Amino acid sequence: MLKIGVIADDFTGATDIASFLVENGMPTVQINDVPTGTQPEGCDAVVISLKTRSCPVQEAIKQSLAALVWLKKQGCQQVYFKYCSTFDSTAEGNIGPVTDALMVALDTSFTVISPALPVNGRTVYQGYLFVMNHLLAESGMRHHPINPMTDSYLPRLMEAQAQGRCGVIPAQTLDEGVAATRAALSRLQQEGYRYAVLDALNERHLEIQGEVLRDAPLVTGGSGLAMGLARQWAKHGVSQARSAGYPLSGRAVVLSGSCSQMTNQQVAFYRQHAPTRDVDVARCLSSETREAYAEALAQWVLSQDSELAPMISATASTQALAAIQQQYGATEASHAVEALFSLLAARLTEGGITRFIVAGGGNPGGGAQNPGITGFYIGPGLFPRGAGGNAPPAPGSPAPKTGKFWGGTFFFPAPKGVLSLFHNSQPPR
């Protein structure tokens, strides 16, 4: 029986949480879009990757509920709504409405909000979300092109977009242990609160959360809480959980479409060392020119014989992105580039590329969501944000990287386990 079913609001975020589940002993499969078949064999957890972070609210609710229906048919014991550790949801955002819809469908009147990921500097204290010791609203997320985060107080953010009151379980309570945390949650529920933000400053806080929430029908948060829950659920060793998803050998390509500040730095550095082509948005807009353009880019990638993987980049600076959106329309440009990456990935797979390093969960995420790849057995994590995996039934190993994470040299140089993905050689096991 399926223990945990995750409904993730973007592609790379889905892989993030899947890697945390695997690293803590739960064999995990990630599935692109709402599944139609039965549960894959040999897994304790399934992560369904949607693209609902920034779509219209009703569409986000529709897709999330469809994913929930499938999970319930598989006998899923716990549902986990996964969003980013930087929350990425304004007053007009989707986290609140999707959470409310899931609560109704699961007939539960109370749930938690736990975006913290301390290993990556995302902590919550007194209900305030911090990014590398800076308040969320004072970080680079304040200028996010799609979901600018101008408030750091999670209860206020949640109440602005959801249908109830939101309380806080402070770090001091978590420090007191499982019993104190469980009692504090019970008090909030009795007082009529619908949601509780959980502070988390360290891994121990996440472990306590996992023990307290082991039997909750619905939890919501980032990847950090998954660590605590997996340690409660896991009956397998980490090596067994990892084994199905070790990356394949063969040629690699980098597809970058995130426009975050961090990805801009990473792309700028990597292009100094590896062959790079920038995406021309104008050539992506119509289906006729897009197909021809995807073929031309594929031929260029396949013709490269460099030691490091060639890169196709749609990453743009804030100023350049604004100009593109003004000229072509934000939605139109985004969808056009996403369609290009999907065509390109399919063509590259046909051409023998087996490893895809994907930066960002939107546009490039389409690259790993091409029609030949329906899901992934998740393998060992490359970093606390980023994982490798194998895709059944199509041969391929994606390594998604969330756009806003890791230093400017993520792509190169990198530790041996990651760098192997960028070399056209056999990755280590």
Residue positions per predicted region:
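Cap/lid and interdomain-hinge subdomains that line or gate substrate/regulatory clefts
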Residues: 1-3, 60, 68-206
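N-terminal basic/disordered segments at the start of proteins
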Residues: 2-44, 60-64, 114-119
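General beta-strand structural signal in soluble alpha/beta enzymes
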Residues: 6-8, 29-31, 79-83, 111-115, ...
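Short acidic, glycine/serine/threonine-rich loops at helix termini
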Residues: 17-19, 91-95, 122-130, 180, ...
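Acidic, glycine-rich loop-and-beta core segments that form the ion-binding/anion-interacting portion
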Residues: 214-281
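C-terminal structural cap/anchor segments
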Residues: 300-359
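Conserved, well-ordered active-site substructure
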Residues: 353-354, 362-404, 410-411
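Residue-level detector of conserved catalytic or cofactor/ligand-binding positions
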Residues: 419-429
